[in-house]
Curated annotation (Swiss-Prot):
Designated gene of the protein: APC10
Family, per entry: Belongs to the APC10 family.
Self-association and partners: Component of the anaphase promoting complex/cyclosome (APC/C), which is composed of at least 10 subunits. Interacts with CDC20-1, CDC20-2, CDC27A and CDC27B.
Subcellular location: Nucleus
Cell cycle as UniProt keyword: yes
Keyword DNA-binding attached: no
Superkingdom assignment: Eukaryota
Name of the protein: Anaphase-promoting complex subunit 10
One of the GO BP terms on file: regulation of DNA endoreduplication
Gene Ontology cellular component annotations, sorted alphabetically: anaphase-promoting complex; nuclear body
Residue ranges of every copy of the DOC domain listed in the record: 6-192
Role: Component of the anaphase promoting complex/cyclosome (APC/C), a cell cycle-regulated E3 ubiquitin-protein ligase complex that controls progression through mitosis and the G1 phase of the cell cycle. The APC/C complex controls several key steps in the cell cycle by mediating the ubiquitination and subsequent degradation of target proteins such as cyclins. The APC/C complex is required for the female gametophyte development and is involved in several other aspects of development. Involved in the control of endoreduplication.
């Protein structure tokens, strides 16, 4: 899994963040396969800024809370990790403090799967979607919704600089010091 953000003793509270994003090789970024939408945005700070790989740009909501980010897939996918880049030092009252992550087949049946409280985060914040059961390492879903329920310092609108969504690789190869380059070699990579 990725390097987790520091989680306090109280379940669901996350403080800090990581300046460098480190993701395991057995995860892949799934956001490029999705249709992204937001509940509202200021002109010039739309949904594309969430995915442009630029930490200087940000999505800014424009309206009443909760602010919603919708991630819809054409087919059911396995998702394991949501990673946000937020910066309390730059954004102050625009920084999210309470976030709810919901999953489902569409808007009609979304269920909350994770609720977290961020405490002055700066950097990449990793939110694992795994359940309490150790066998539940991912969520199988058509849609993921990230709801910003409140901001720091009672701010109204929110800033999120980047979002990445990761799922397990379909056929992870056991950790080896090299990668096979041909399909023929790949077929002999494991024993039955």
């Amino acid at each position: 899994m990725a390097t987790e953000s520091s989680e306090s003793e109280e379940e669901g509270k996350i403080s800090g963040g990581n300046y460098k994003l480190i993701i395991d090789d057995d995860l892949r970024e799934m956001g490029k396969n999705a249709a992204w939408s937001v509940s509202s945005c200021k002109p010039g700070n739309g949904v594309t800024t969430l995915r442009d790989d630029n930490l200087e740009t940000y999505w800014q909501s424009d309206g009443l809370q909760p602010h919603l980010i919708n991630i819809q897939f054409q087919k059911k996918v396995k998702l394991q990790l949501v990673v946000l880049y937020v910066d309390f030092k730059l954004d102050e009252s625009y920084t999210p403090s309470k976030i709810s992550i919901r999953a489902g087949d569409g808007f009609h049946n979304l269920k909350e799967i994770k609720s977290v409280e961020l405490v002055k985060p700066t950097g990449w914040v990793c939110l694992s979607l795994s359940g309490t059961d150790p066998r539940e390492t991912f969520v199988n879903t058509f849609m993921l919704q990230i709801a910003i329920l409140s901001n720091h310092l009672n701010g109204r609108d929110t800033h999120i600089r980047q979002i990445k969504v990761y799922g397990p690789r379909p056929n992870p190869i056991p950790h080896q010091p090299f990668q096979f380059t041909s399909m023929e070699f790949l077929t002999y990579s494991t024993l039955r």
